[in-house]
Amino acid sequence: MSDQDLVISALHVAPVANPDHEILKGIDLTVGQGEVHAIMGPNGSGKTTLAYALMGHPAYVVTSGKVLWQGQDLLKLSVDKRARLCMFLAFQYPMAVPGLSVASFLRSAINAHRLGLNPDPTVDPTDAFKGGIPMGEFRKLVREKMALLKMDESIAARYVNEGFSGGEKKRLEMLQMAVLEPQMAILDETDSGLDIDALRIVAEGVNAMLNPKMGVLLITHYQRLLNYITPDTVHVLAAGRIILSGGKDLALRLEAEGYEPILAAEGLEAAVGDEAPEAAPEKAAEPAMETAH
């Protein structure tokens, strides 16, 4: 185990609004550099809660457990400090930010990210046009990454996610990932709401970004995304804990049989949907998190 591994130990998480109702009930998981781990599970099993807890979402409280990342106790860090440690979260439901152009948003995000790596008191990360990445370098970088994701360059002048289709929103999430080059990427149901063509383009973009220095936690409900992105390990999350792990064959088994046989083997038939409270805060709290990319 190295400092570049994400190490989750006995993690228990509950909603702030109902701290006695734990959604995650003892998650143990290690994601190493260059590894892709897929988290699959029925609705309400705690998949999104895991993603949000790792990034410090204010709607959730860690009741016990530990998370180590880059040699630090992640749970003691603020959201912005987690992001500056090269962690990235792609949302399942990206929010619109009227009045903020994609170009300004991306440049501010890049500046904040680079300041996290190399602090410079003369640069204001909240100002996209003062200091930070030179405009020429920024334009070249964004054009290169847009081409990778087959995005129209005109999207840079539009307001963030305002009037975007589902596919455009997901591609913008991937564009953020591409320009920021995180060392740990958490992709929360990136395949949801995508038709087969958009799914293929997004998956090809993710594959092009995979590298030996980046770990990926890929959260998905369906096996179809794994037809394009090959995971090193597949985990089944149900009733707030990982009940089974395996290779890609496990995802194929889930596609063929569904979750019921595995849940039944664990005596969890009645647990399907038990964790539904995790879904409640998703849309309400996302705008504040969007800047944490």
Predicted features by range, described:
Residues 2-8, 12-28, 32-38, 57-62, ...:
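A short, flexible loop at the N-terminus of ABC-type nucleotide-binding domains that lies
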Residues 40-42:
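The feature captures the beta-strand-to-loop junction immediately N-terminal to the Walker
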Residues 66-82, 161:
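ABC ATPase NBD Q-loop/coupling interface
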Residues 95-183:
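ABC-family P-loop ATPase nucleotide-binding domains
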Residues 186-190, 197:
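Walker B catalytic motif
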Residues 199-212:
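Helical segment within the ABC ATPase nucleotide-binding domain
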Residues 213-221:
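Conserved H-loop
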Residues 237, 241-264:
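Conserved beta-strand-loop-alpha-helix hinge in the C-terminal portion
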